[in-house]
Structure formats: C-alpha cells, structure tokens
C-alpha cells in the first residue's frame, strides 16, 4: 500500500513537472535569411532551403521571409505566375506540404503562395502565450497585404482553415473562391 502511494505521488510529481515544462513560455527564435528575393511588390529576405527540403521541390520556387511585425518573420514558398492561389497548412506541418499540389497546377497561369505559420517550419518560433487565433489571422493577413493580393483562391486544412479564412476576412473582397478541408470555423457575429 505504501509503495503504491509513493509510486502514485512520484508519478503525480513527474506529471506536474512535465506540464510546467510544456506550458512555459520560451524565448522568441527569429530566423535569419541570406540575400534578397525580388518580387513585383518589392524585395524580401531570401531563405535558402536546406538540402533535404530543396530536394523535394522543383526549380522555380522562391523561398523568402516576410516580417509581419518586429521580430515575427513568416517563411513563404511560392511558385508559378498568374492568378494567386493561397494555400494554408495545418498543425504541425509547413507550407512545403502543398508542393505536390503545386506540381499538378498550371504554373504558367497560377501563382501558388505557401506561407508557413509562425511557430512552425522556418518561421519565427514564439512563446506559447502568443499562439492565439487572432495573432495568426493578423500575421497571415499581413503576408497577403504585403504581397498586395487583390484577389485569390484559397485552400486550407486543419488549423489552416480558421487561420486562412480569418486572415482573408480582414481583407474583404480578396477571396474569390475557397476549398476548406478537414477543418472548422465559425462565422463572425
């Protein structure tokens, strides 16, 4: 009986320590790029992909950061030219998730924009307390407005559904079509 109580107390203490470690707020980790990428709307900080990531995409991709707020950089992959198609991954993936979709599209007629949410992939890592839906919506909207998108088709899944649709709701008139998969979101009140 005493052994059972001791083991139970030890397990409870370990659980408390594990929870404290998991929920603590960490420091912001800001990625660094190298060089510049030129787009029609301006120059951005280039990010050369590591070999393992570069090996799974075709030529023609641009990899860069958009600083949406001081110290908050979002990594963006894009490929193609033409009508903007904004795709938003879920958790815990990255914009690289949509590379196989992009490979099937007519890249001479569409521009596939694949941002990676803050906290994931090569984007800035933030404290747990900063991961709110409102923050992610605002940051992704800043990506879209920085790229000066006046219209786009959107596809998103998982957590990318509410983040992407929320980001687009902050720029009325941009959304021209949507494919929302394996997600949920609520309408504004």
Identify the residue ranges that each predicted region occupies.
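Alpha/beta-hydrolase fold catalytic core
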Residues: 2-84, 107-110, 150
């Amino acid at each position: 009986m005493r052994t059972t109580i001791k083991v139970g107390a030890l397990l409870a203490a370990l659980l408390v320590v594990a929870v404290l470690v998991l929920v603590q707020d960490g420091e912001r980790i800001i990625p660094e790029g190298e060089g510049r990428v030129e787009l029609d709307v301006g120059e951005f900080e280039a990010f050369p992909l590591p070999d393992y990531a570069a090996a799974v995409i075709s030529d023609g991709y641009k990899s860069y950061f958009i600083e949406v707020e001081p110290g908050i950089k979002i990594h963006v992959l894009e490929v193609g030219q033409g009508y903007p198609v904004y795709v938003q991954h879920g958790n815990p993936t990255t914009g690289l998730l949509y590379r196989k979709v992009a490979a099937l599209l007519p890249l001479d007629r569409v521009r596939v924009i694949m941002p990676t949410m803050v906290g994931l992939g090569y984007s800035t890592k933030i404290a747990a307390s900063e991961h709110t839906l409102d923050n992610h919506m605002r940051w992704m909207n800043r990506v879209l407005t920085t790229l000066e998108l006046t219209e786009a088709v959107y596809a998103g899944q998982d957590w990318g559904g509410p983040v992407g649709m929320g980001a687009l709701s902050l720029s009325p008139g941009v959304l021209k079509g949507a494919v929302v998969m394996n997600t949920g979101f609520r309408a504004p009140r």
